[in-house]
């Protein structure tokens, strides 16, 4: 039964999805990882085994396992990190500012107009995913990090300004700074809604 006075009750009426908390697609690691893997396979993308093996993830199962552990460590729903990574990298095909060897799965530091490779670079897959998780936590809450900070842009975020997936897009985020600019992860229209659309197809 939903508590109408509690946060989960509020979510059912506001139509937004909390970034923090336990997975919405499974109650254990094996189930959640399998659903992420299945979604990747359905995309018909070819996993960049050679490039990501160098960073410790030779296959999509290993990648999703690392992703799950890093998300759970900071109380972030793993499927949100997965969907965002797939959206940002085109199912790990890359092709934009960020290159596969940079182990940057969230477009960290890839500001509109930057040249190829002009963004954050990490030493391996786990560190890259950890940075993405930490950056998302910066937007989602004001809680301290559980792991040491590897996200060099963590302190650039105004904490807690996008607690919901749907608010990750600046155009949909109701919070604004003193200049009247909206907060959020990305400037693209419906950014957070596109993440949720992918998650909804995983159940």
Where are these regions (language model features)?
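Short, aromatic- and glycine-rich surface loops/edge beta-strands on solvent-exposed regions
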Residues: 2
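Catalytic cores of secreted/periplasmic lytic hydrolases that degrade extracellular macromolecules
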Residues: 6-203
């Amino acid at each position: 039964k939903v508590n109408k006075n509690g946060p989960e009750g509020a979510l059912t009426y506001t139509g937004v999805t909390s970034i923090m908390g336990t997975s919405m697609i499974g109650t254990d690691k094996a189930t959640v990882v399998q659903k992420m893997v299945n979604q990747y396979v359905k995309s018909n993308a070819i996993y960049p085994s050679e490039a990501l093996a160098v960073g410790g993830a030779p296959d999509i199962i290993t990648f999703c396992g690392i992703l799950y552990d890093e998300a759970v460590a900071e109380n972030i729903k793993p499927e949100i990190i997965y969907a965002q990574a797939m959206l940002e990298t085109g199912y790990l095909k890359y092709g934009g500012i960020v290159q596969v060897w940079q182990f940057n799965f969230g477009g960290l530091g890839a500001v509109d107009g930057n040249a190829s490779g002009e963004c954050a670079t990490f030493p391996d897959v786990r560190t890259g995913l950890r940075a993405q998780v930490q950056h998302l936590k910066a937007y989602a809450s004001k809680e301290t990090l559980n792991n040491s900070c590897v996200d060099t842009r963590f302190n650039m975020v105004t904490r807690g300004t996008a607690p919901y997936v749907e608010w990750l897009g600046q155009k949909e985020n109701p919070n604004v700074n003193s200049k009247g600019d909206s907060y959020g992860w990305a400037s693209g229209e419906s950014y957070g809604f596109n993440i949720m659309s992918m998650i909804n197809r995983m159940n």
